Amino acid sequence: MTGPELKKLREDLGEAIGRELTVADMAKLCGLPDPVGATTIRKWEVSGPSGPVAELLRILAMASDRYPILEMFNVFERHDVPVKERPARQQAFREQMRGDVRRRIG
């Protein structure tokens, strides 16, 4: 994930949960401590995060309709899930992810 992609993700997650996310909110999502967390996010919005944080952000991105549901989480395309139920189940999953984002930022 690049810095501009992280900044776009912050905007997209904010849109998904219905409120703008600050850099402090993103720091909470990443588990970064105050007061250095927001500063770290600002740096990452230039250089990009790495390692486990980048993977965590890829997972949290699924809260937004603008990002795909990662294959390891996509249990909706299995043969035992009726095709006409898949969109509703995917939407319910995204709502669950949005709830997780809201819970993490408090």
Task: Name each model-derived stretch.
Residues 1-19:
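A short, Lys/Arg-rich alpha-helix, primarily the initiator
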Residues 17-40:
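Short alpha-helical DNA-recognition segment
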Residues 7, 27, 38-42, 57-58:
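Key DNA-contacting residues within the recognition helix of helix-turn-helix
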Residues 1-4, 21, 36, 49, ...:
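Short coil/turn linker and secondary-structure boundary residues
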Residues 62-106:
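Short, charged recognition helix plus adjacent turn
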